[in-house]
Amino acid sequence: THCISSAASDVYKRQTINIDGKTALLGDKVYYRVHIDASRLTDTAYKVWRLGAVDDYDEEYLTLDAKHVEILDETGRDRTGEFNIQDKDGVLYAFAKTVDTQIPATGETVPGDPQPDDLKAYSEKTDKDYDPLKDPSIDQSLLGHTYQVVMPMTVTKVKDGHTVENTATQVTNDKRDKTNTVTNPLKEINPTKDVTVQVGGDSIDGKSVYLNHTFLYRLDSSILPPGRAYQTVTDWGGTDQLNTEYDQYLGNWAVYASRDLYRDGQMLAAKGEKIAGSGFDSSKFGGNLFTVDADDNGKVTADATQAYLDLVSADNEHEAGWVLYLQCKRIAVADEVPNTWTETINGQPRESNKVVTKTPDMTPSIHLEKVDTPTLKQDGQEQADRDDPKQALKMDADNIGITFIITNTSKTDPATGDGAWFKASDLNLDDSTIVGDAHVDMDSLTYPADWDTLVLKPGESVSVTGTLKGVKEGETHTDRAIVTGTPLVECAPSNGDPFNDKTDGGEDTDPEYSTGDVTEIDGKQLCADTQTASNTDDWNGYRAKPLASTGTAVLGLAGGALAVLLAGGSLLVFRKRHYAQGSGRHTAVNAGK
């Protein structure tokens, strides 16, 4: 006979659990057992010169630990030392050693040593190759017993659907008896990785996770098949190395059954039910089924407890599997954050697929341009934008229309175009005079009709108009504007436990947001982010001096020189004063020259 059993200890080696036809997984340690039956070979009329077995195994998928092949008799006694053993090209040869043999016909003793050095060649000999007068035979006291050749194998390659076959042949002198062939279908199993926002939610693999938002890494275990050749599960868990530059693990985790879980044939937890987690009450299971720990370097380790391993080991009738969620927070902008996890079952590691998320720079910002309305209408924004005193407008009157153009310049997610929004009614426009005494009348600004409901999305602009009043003849004027606003961004869920004790992960609960008050616009939940200020923008203008009367022509030269001197002196003082205020860009100029 010839059977196969799975085991991990010496105790098991002496038990024959027939696993013919059962499924083998990568890393499984199985013991093929080849039987040599010499029980009926006593009192034969001839000497038994050769006794052993040849076992042809599938070396592409199985690796034999030839050093630990053992031969046991029917009492379980180790008889390995009495046999020669060789492993060659996927075939194991085990033959009883030749011993010093007395030849009655000659009265001589033929030495048993040296032993055959090539057991393949030895196994292929026939009776014709054996000379009973010159060749040694085996120890005849081995006869009358049965032996078991125990071959420790490891499944080192799997291919779904492939069946490994193992056929042994007993060799007694010239007689060859094929034993039954043992077959084991191989099953390829693999863990998978995903990333999502909520338990059971759609995958966001390849998509964006926004800065300071929480999300879930999803770690699906392999699915253990029923009818396993190696039924005992000694360990089941894995590690996930987070990139702490981008991902902060928040300490919240949960495990759900991905297949029904049984105890003593009764369902203990249904597929999709939460069976472990941070702060989870596991009393119904008689204790924790999983532990999850993280080190300071962002390596998260999950392990099934002995309680869970015992449940799975005891049930070889059903599939087994689980899914772990880890709550993380994205803490930096990134083009690409890859993540995988490594699952280990019975000491055999398996790598998952890779998921990738990105975090676009979506910094909220607003931009302000301040222009004079007449030039804007006639020549366009560029001509009307008088940031520099050299571009100052020569004004014909003491007042002029001013237009403030406010643009949402927030950075966006290239994939979706999403970015911060600004409610126009939240914008606060401020204008102050830098040079001169005139000012923009901020109490009589004109806003668009839909100002109270208007929302500026990225790239959109709005114009507010007002009037600059009080520029006197001969005076230069500079005023500076700035706008502040509160950006509205997609609400970031809080760092609280997203799983709570509901089996669905609490998707029906109202999310608590970690950022500001919630505003709903176009069905989107938006939250207030930190207030943002625009650039400052200047506008420059001047009015010419009134023409001097002709009666002072004689004094013109001296008077003119004195005026320039006085003006120059006052300009220097003025310059100094403004530099002292840190406003080096805005120097007074005699724009009337």
Describe the predicted segments one by one.
Residues 564-593:
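C-terminal membrane-anchoring or membrane-association module
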Residues 542-559:
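Extracellular Ser/Thr-rich, low-complexity/disordered mucin-like segments
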Residues 175-186, 350-359, 496-542:
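Terminal edge beta-strands and adjacent linker/stalk segments
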Residues 34-35, 97-165, 219-220, 296-342, ...:
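Low-complexity, intrinsically disordered segments enriched in Ser/Thr together with acidic residues
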Residues 46-119, 233-304, 410, 415-458:
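A surface/secretory-pathway sequence property marking extracellular, secreted
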Residues 16-18, 79, 84-88, 93-141, ...:
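Surface-exposed intrinsically disordered loops and tails
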Residues 24-49, 207-236, 387-419:
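Short beta-strand elements of extracellular/lumenal beta-sandwich folds
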Residues 1-8, 12:
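Single conserved hydrophobic/aromatic residue that forms the stacking wall/gate
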